[in-house]
Every structure is written in C-alpha cells, then in structure tokens.
C-alpha cells in the first residue's frame, strides 16, 4: 500500500532544492519559452476550501506540465490583505479583551493587525503545501507589502491625474456595518415583505392619494410624490402639493416616466437620498435630497420622535403610528428582491455619500482588445458574460470606511487644496502650507488585487524587493501572463478589473488565456453548505486519502463549463486507481530489480512495442488536452492507459512473454512522467522504486523532460487489439458453457478480414496461454454444433462434442422463467392507469428502465439457449 506520509517529505526536499522557482528546471529549459500563471491571492484570513483546492490543483497541473516541457515557469504566489474580513477578525479579538479599536487609535490598531497577520495569518499557505502545489515561494507577495503599496499609490495617482478617479457625492450601496460597497458586492435575494399603502392628503383638501411603498421608514425623506405623465387618473393633481403624514411638510406632485402605472396605486413616493432610481428622478426635477438616517442606520432629527431608532426597528413603530392616525389604507404581502452585503448579510441601503470612484471610461481599451481576440476565454461562452457586464459598467466606488487597507493617497490642506501624491508630501504643492491631512478612507481590496498581474512582476514597486523577489526583466518575460485559472464567480470582482486596470497602464491585456472553472458541488449537484452537512473539506480528504487522490479526482471531474459533482465514492475510485498502479510496480519488481530509462534501451519485445505504441497515443492525447485545458479528458486518458492498457493487458500479456517485463518497466517509468503533474507524489515514489534510487540522493521526476509524441507503426496496435479481442471472446464463450477458468482443448477463430490470420500466427502463444486453450485453429466457415461468440472483428467457436449441456440448459431455463415472471409483473404494473397516474414520476421511469433491462436479458438468454440446442 502506498504510504501517503511520504508526501510531506517529498515536498520539503523539492522545495528546499528550489525546484519550484523560475530556474528550478534550468537543466531542461529551452530558449524563449516562458510561462506565467498567477495564483488568485486568497484572503490572509482564509483556510483551504474545496474551491481553492480545485483552482490550485488545475494551476499546478499546468505549472508542472510546462516546467517539465522546458519552459521557464513563474507560478506567482501571494495573499490578499482582505480589508473588511481582516479588520473584523482583529476587532472581534480586541472586543473579547474589552478593547474597542477607537480606544487604540488608527496607528496602534493597524499595528495590532500586522501582529495578527504575522502570528495567525497565512495558515492557508501551509495547507497549499499539503496539496502539493509548486509556486515560486521565494517570490511570495502580500497585497500590503511595501512594493505593492508603492504600486497601488502609483496606479491611483496616475488615474487621479487623468481624471479617471474622481470624488463626489454619489448614491452608493451602503452597509451599515461594513460601509461602502461596489455594485457587485451586493447579493440580491428573494424577500417576503409587505407593501404599505399610505394616504397622502392634498394640501388644504380632504382628498388624498394612496402611495404604495415597501420602506415606510424612509418617508420622512420624501421630497415629492410621483405619477406617470400618461396616467389620466392623476393628471389633474400634477404640480399640486400633498402633506406628509406626521411631519406635516408639503411636497410637490410631479410627473415622470419612471413610474410603473401598474405598480400599487400608480402613485409612488420620491426619496432621492435613499433610493437609486429616486436619486436620478431627484436630479432631473431638482428636488431636495434629505438623508433620514446616518452611516449606522440610526434615524436622525428629520424623523422627529423616531430619532435614535435603528432603521429596521423604526419601521414597525412608524407603521403603528401611521395606523393610529388613520393614514394606512391597507398592508399587503409582497415579494421583492432585496440587496444584502456579500460579507455580513446585512440589508444594504442606497445612501448618498462623498466617495472616490473609478470612472467607467477606464474599461474602454480592454473592451476593444478583447473584441480583437487578444484574450481567449475557456469555455468560450464566458466572453458573452464579460462583454455584457462591461457594456453596462458603472463607475466603481473604491473608497471604504476602514482602517486596514491602502489609505487613499490624497491630501487636503488648510486652504482647501486637494492633491494626490505617491509619497508623503512635506508641503502643499499649491500654497506650500505644512498643515494638511491625508484622506482617512482606504481603497477597495479589489483595487490592489486588480494590479496583481503586473505589480507582482515589479511594476510600480520602485526598488523595493528588486533582485530579491522580482527582477527587471520579469515584465518582459512574463507579461502578459500566459494563463489565468480561477472560478467564474470572481470574473467581475477580479478578472475584469485586472483586465481594465492593467490595460490602462500597459496597453496590453494581462492574460493570453482565461480559464474559468465551475463550482464544486456534492454528488446530487447541490451547493456545499454546513446546513446540508455535505461539505467536503479538502484538508480532511488529504488526511484520509492523500493529496494525489484529491488532485486526480478533481482533474477527472473538471469538465469545461460544468459544475463538479464531488463525492467520497469518486475519491474511492481514484484510491483504487492508486492501488492499481502501486501493484503494477510490485509485479514489475518481482521480475526485475531495476529498470533503465526508456531513452537508454531498444525495444525488442513485440508486446513492449505494442504498449509503447499505446503510450505514444496517450502522450499525444494528454498533451493536446492540456494545451486546450481539457483537464478531465487528459486525466481520463491517463486513467485508461494505466488501468486498461498497461495494468490489465500489458501485465496480463507479459505472463506469456516474460522477456518483455524489463522493457515494460522502462515504459512504465516514462509513463509516470506523464502522470506526474496530476499525481506528483506517487509518481515520484514509483519512479524511484523502479529506478532503484531515492529522492534524497537523486534528481526529482518533476524536473525530467515531459514525454513528447513520436509516431508509431499502427500495425502492431491492430494485431494486439485482435489478440485481446480473441482472448475476451473465447473467455466469454467459455463462460456460456460453465467453463470459465477451465482449460479447453481447442477454439476456432473466424476473422472478418481473412488476410490477417497470416500476420497473427506468430502471436498465437498469447491467446493459448491467456484464453487457456490447448490449440487454436483458424476457420473460414461457421461451425455446426458449437457455441459461438460474435465480436466486432471476429467470431469464436467452441465445439460441444464432449460437453454435458443438461445442467447448463436447466440453469438457463430457470433464469429465463424467473426473468419472464419479473417482466410480466412490471408490464402489468405499467399497464395500470391508476399506477401511472398516482406513482411518482421517477418511480414510473425506474420501472420502465427495469423492464427494458429485463427484455435485453431475456433476449440474450434465448439466443444462448438457441445456440446450445443447435
């Protein structure tokens, strides 16, 4: 049994030798072949989940493949500072000690965050190592390291100077816990709420209009009531005034096409400071903008007696007051979509605030370059999603009300001058005042990670880390990056932003190829969640099975564009595969103590030539699939070669030609190189066992050359495929007459291609030994009184002269009778209209399928009986 505990030792040896670094494969590097892939930097607070495991596995397969194929490879690792998440973790720890961050002040709090990062952050890095991934660890970056801080400042200042970053009062998404959010940080969910119909009386009149709203707590901020200009019901009221309940403030009735006449009563309140659409209406009609609660969602002085209440708590009390005063006409159940903060699940509020924004015009160049095909998406349909999102792009809110993060490099002096600077200024550049302060907000985390594809290669770092973790030629060698692999769920959060931020600076898209994988779900296709109890923890899977088994399972399931349905059964299947190739090693070493490298021997055995031809087909298919990111097809090709071609038939056939074993072992060693990017540890172990070496004192398989395809004579494959077909067919025919493992005197083979028998005569020993026949004869006619098995290219006959058929016929008749009874029962059930009408659909379908299977079995037994009776 393979010892998975070797994985840690093997990994440590390879890392210490520097194999993962850019020049780790220097002995096999070829000129002008560079490959770069960026690790999506996981949060410093994170632990390895199954989505990470998939991303990192696929990235590492490509990294190892390219490294073995002679490329100079950079697999860039890193961690994201994760502004909100990290600040929340440290805040909670301090609160547990009875300390609020405000008591410490900004500088001391940030020191605490750095302390936490050094002590507890980055746990995920060790978990990545257990997965066996091979990034250039010496180049590990953190989105808050000094070099990347320099790059962020440079990017910000350049955009600021181009007026592509601006500050102003905007309607934004606001979380009362986490502050400003960009549009894609808001998750919309179905909500079972209420629609409140409130009476707004006309000024100096007993007439009233009924306004429908889902958010009565905001009505103190109403500055108009709105109807559709074509709604004849309300035409006479336009330009008149209504009186707000409770506050008794007069507001105007306006007409605007934004109103849906069919919604509620056709009359809606306009709250420009608390609704995205009303904000636009307010601008069009020059309305007042009145905010009725603060940044924490607490109602302010505009709300009279309700001041000091939290917005959602206030709703019930405001409605109760309106009801007591007779202003509520009715309340209806109402389903709608509500935005929630993607981090804390708090209801998000539209809120007017002075924030920093990146103008949407920044994306234009990247849109044009994608249209020209400079980046290719896998699967291709993601280009449609990318284009649709970019087409509807809005200005991106990049300021966050946090302390942990990249503080916005904008300064304000006492004379109200504003400027951006990459370095802390000494005086105001306009008035030379020394009395100035820096903007207190920090940048959205995605702003810094949006520079990742170029900042990790030294762009904007100034001299920090130069010649230690990056070099001057990195941008030339590795930009644009060769490939990005990540989940489709961050296409807009991260990928699109990297594309427009990098292109705006370097005028070149950051990636040649973009592979977006789907989600990892359970075997029933459900999302993994703690509540369902269906979460597969990769850390536990590695402990129970091994890193190799998890990696190969994920690769087998990674079909482009389809969700990955992972289960323990799939992991067990790959464990069986691992045992299969481990046992192949045992068989080989029973016959030989050591196997030469394939390049150092000449193949003489016909069997070895056949297995080598199958291996070359495998090489061709694996390379082609990896080059097109069809990971599942590449893994399946390897699975079939090792299991079917080598273990099932190569080893089996070698029992008839013992001299072939030495050559088969050399082929097996070469095939382990092909497997290594997928299963690096067991391939390493088996390779050294067959070479009679140890990794401690020998080079690793991971820096050997990846096998290249060499065309082979197809005739040897044709001959051996007929041999195998003959063996299988004879075994099948023997099983029909209960002679499964017994030796028989003679079998006859009738080939569809009569010419082939002359070529195959030399190989009869394989059939005689493995099919257990004393003799094989060729026939050109069907034999009477013989059991027959028909396959694609031949027919097998075994005469029945000396076979007692009575017991066999009785057994088959009994089987037939049993199947007929089961078939009759199912047929009766499916002919019953009541059963069809009342049974669950899936039960009906299962019974139909069972009936079809019974028919097939009955037909097969009938044919067998007919053959036996002549």
From Swiss-Prot:
Its EC number(s): 6.1.1.9
The record's subcellular locations are: Cytoplasm
| InterPro entries documented for this protein | aa-tRNA-synth_I_CS (IPR001412), aa-tRNA-synth_Ia (IPR002300), Anticodon_Ia_Val (IPR033705), M/V/L/I-tRNA-synth_anticd-bd (IPR013155), Rossmann-like_a/b/a_fold (IPR014729), tRNA-bd_arm (IPR010978), tRNAsynth_Ia_anticodon-bd (IPR009080), Val-tRNA_synth_C_sf (IPR037118)
Residue numbers covered by motif 'KMSKS' region: 527-531
Domain of life here? Bacteria
SUPFAM superfamilies, A to Z: Anticodon-binding domain of a subclass of class I aminoacyl-tRNA synthetases, Nucleotidylyl transferase, tRNA-binding arm, ValRS/IleRS/LeuRS editing domain
Q: Write out the coiled-coil annotation as residue ranges.
A: 800-870
Which GO terms label this protein's molecular function in UniProt? aminoacyl-tRNA deacylase activity; ATP binding; valine-tRNA ligase activity
Q: What catalytic reaction does the record list?
A: tRNA(Val) + L-valine + ATP = L-valyl-tRNA(Val) + AMP + diphosphate
> Motif 'HIGH' region: which residue numbers?
42-52
- Keywords for this protein: Aminoacyl-tRNA synthetase, ATP-binding, Coiled coil, Cytoplasm, Ligase, Nucleotide-binding, Protein biosynthesis
**Can you supply a Gene Ontology BP term from the record?**
valyl-tRNA aminoacylation
Where does it sit, as one GO cellular component term? cytosol
**Positions that bind ATP:** 530
Q: What class of enzyme is it?
A: ligase
- PANTHER family per record: VALINE--TRNA LIGASE, CHLOROPLASTIC_MITOCHONDRIAL 2 (PTHR11946:SF93), VALYL-TRNA SYNTHETASES (PTHR11946)
- Quaternary state and interactors: Monomer.
Q: What exactly does this protein do?
A: Catalyzes the attachment of valine to tRNA(Val). As ValRS can inadvertently accommodate and process structurally similar amino acids such as threonine, to avoid such errors, it has a 'posttransfer' editing activity that hydrolyzes mischarged Thr-tRNA(Val) in a tRNA-dependent manner.
**Domain remark from Swiss-Prot or TrEMBL:** ValRS has two distinct active sites: one for aminoacylation and one for editing. The misactivated threonine is translocated from the active site to the editing site.
The UniProt similarity line reads: Belongs to the class-I aminoacyl-tRNA synthetase family. ValS type 1 subfamily.
Protein name in UniProt? Valine--tRNA ligase
Organism equals Campylobacter jejuni (strain RM1221)
Q: Please state the gene responsible for encoding this protein.
A: valS
């Amino acid at each position: 049994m393979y010892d998975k505990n070797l994985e840690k030792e093997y990994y440590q040896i390879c890392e210490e030798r520097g194999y993962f670094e850019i020049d780790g494969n220097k002995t096999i590097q070829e000129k002008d072949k560079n490959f770069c892939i960026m690790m999506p930097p996981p949060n410093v607070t994170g632990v390895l989940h199954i989505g990470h495991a998939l991303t990192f596995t696929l990235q590492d397969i490509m990294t190892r493949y390219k490294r073995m194929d002679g490329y100079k490879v950079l697999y860039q690792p890193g961690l994201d500072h994760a502004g909100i998440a990290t600040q929340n973790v440290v805040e909670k720890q301090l609160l547990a000690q009875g300390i609020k961050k405000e008591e410490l002040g900004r500088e001391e709090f940030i020191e605490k965050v750095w302390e936490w990062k050094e002590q507890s952050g980055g746990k995920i890095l060790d978990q990545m190592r257990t997965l066996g991934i091979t990034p250039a660890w010496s180049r590990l970056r953190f989105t808050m390291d000094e070099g990347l801080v320099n790059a962020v400042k440079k990017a910000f200042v350049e955009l600021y100077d181009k007026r592509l970053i601006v500050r102003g009062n905007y309607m934004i998404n606001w979380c009362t816990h986490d502050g400003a959010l960009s549009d894609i940080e808001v998750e919309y969910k179905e909500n079972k709420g209420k629609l409140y119909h409130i009476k707004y009386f006309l000024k100096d009149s007993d007439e009233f209009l009924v306004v429908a709203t889902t958010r009565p707590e905001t009505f103190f901020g109403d500055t108009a009531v709105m109807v559709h200009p074509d709604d004849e019901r309300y035409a006479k009221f336009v330009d008149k005034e209504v009186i707000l309940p409770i506050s008794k403030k007069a507001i105007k009735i306006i007409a605007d096409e934004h109103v849906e006449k069919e919604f509620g009563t056709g009359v809606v309140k306009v709250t420009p400071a608390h609704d995205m659409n009303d904000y636009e209406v307010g601008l069009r009609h020059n309305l007042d903008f009145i905010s009725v609660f603060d940044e924490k969602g607490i109602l302010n002085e505009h709300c009279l007696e309700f001041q000091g209440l939290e917005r959602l708590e206030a709703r019930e009390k405001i409605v109760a007051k309106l009801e007591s005063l007779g202003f509520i006409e009715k309340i209806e159940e109402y389903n709608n979509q509500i935005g929630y903060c993607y981090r804390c699940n708090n209801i998000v509020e539209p809120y007017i605030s002075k924030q920093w924004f990146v103008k949407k015009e920044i994306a234009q160049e990247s849109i044009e370059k994608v249209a020209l095909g400079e980046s290719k998406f896998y699967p291709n349909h993601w280009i449609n999603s990318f284009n649709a999102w970019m087409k509807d792009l809005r200005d991106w809110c990049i300021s966050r009300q946090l302390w942990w993060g990249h503080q916005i490099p904008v300064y304000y002096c006492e004379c109200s001058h504003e400027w951006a600077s990459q370095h802390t200024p000494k005086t105001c550049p306009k008035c030379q005042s020394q009395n100035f302060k820096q903007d207190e907000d920090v940048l959205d985390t995605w702003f810094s990670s949006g520079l990742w594809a170029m900042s990790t290669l030294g762009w904007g770092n100034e001299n920090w880390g130069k010649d230690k973790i990056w070099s001057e030629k990195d941008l030339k060698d590795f930009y644009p990056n060769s490939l990005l692999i990540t989940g489709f769920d961050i296409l807009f959060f991260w990928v699109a932003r990297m594309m427009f931020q990098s292109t705006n600076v370097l005028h070149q898209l950051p990636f040649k190829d973009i592979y977006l994988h789907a989600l990892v779900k359970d075997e029933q296709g459900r999302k993994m969640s703690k509540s369902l109890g269906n979460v597969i923890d990769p850390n536990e899977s590695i402990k129970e099975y091994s890193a190799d088994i998890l990696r190969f399972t994920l690769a087998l399931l990674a079909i482009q564009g389809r969700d990955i349905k992972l289960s323990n059964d799939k992991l067990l299947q790959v464990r069986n595969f691992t045992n299969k190739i481990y046992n192949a090693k045992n068989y080989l070493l029973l016959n030989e103590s050591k196997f030469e490298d394939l390049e150092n021997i000449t193949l003489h055995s016909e069997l070895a030539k056949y297995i080598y031809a199958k291996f070359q087909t495998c090489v061709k298919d694996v390379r082609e699939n990896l080059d097109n990111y069809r990971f599942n097809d590449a893994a399946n090709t390897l699975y079939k070669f090792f299991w079917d071609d080598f273990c099932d038939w190569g080893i089996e056939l070698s029992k008839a030609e013992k001299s072939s074993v030495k050559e088969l072992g050399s082929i097996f060693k070469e095939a382990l190189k092909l497997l290594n990017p997928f299963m690096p540890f067991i391939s390493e172990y088996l390779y050294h066992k067959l070479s009679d070496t140890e990794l401690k004192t020998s080079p690793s398989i991971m820096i050997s050359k990846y096998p290249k395809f060499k065309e082979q004579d197809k005739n040897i494959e044709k001959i051996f495929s007929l041999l195998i077909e003959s063996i299988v067919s004879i075994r099948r025919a023997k099983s029909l007459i209960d002679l499964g493992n017994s030796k028989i005197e003679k079998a006859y083979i009738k080939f569809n291609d009569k010419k082939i028998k002359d070529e195959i005569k030399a190989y009869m020993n394989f059939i005689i030994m493995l099919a257990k026949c004393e003799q094989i004869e060729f026939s050109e006619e069907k034999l009477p009184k013989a059991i027959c098995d028909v396959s694609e290219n031949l027919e097998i006959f075994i005469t029945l002269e000396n076979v007692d058929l009575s017991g066999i016929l009785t057994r088959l008749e009994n089987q037939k009778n049993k199947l007929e009874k089961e078939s009759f029962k199912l047929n009766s059930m499916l002919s019953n209209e009541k059963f069809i009408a009342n049974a669950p659909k899936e039960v009906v379908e299962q019974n139909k399928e069972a009936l079809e299977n019974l028919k097939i079995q009955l037909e097969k037994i009938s044919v067998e009986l007919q053959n036996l009776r002549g």
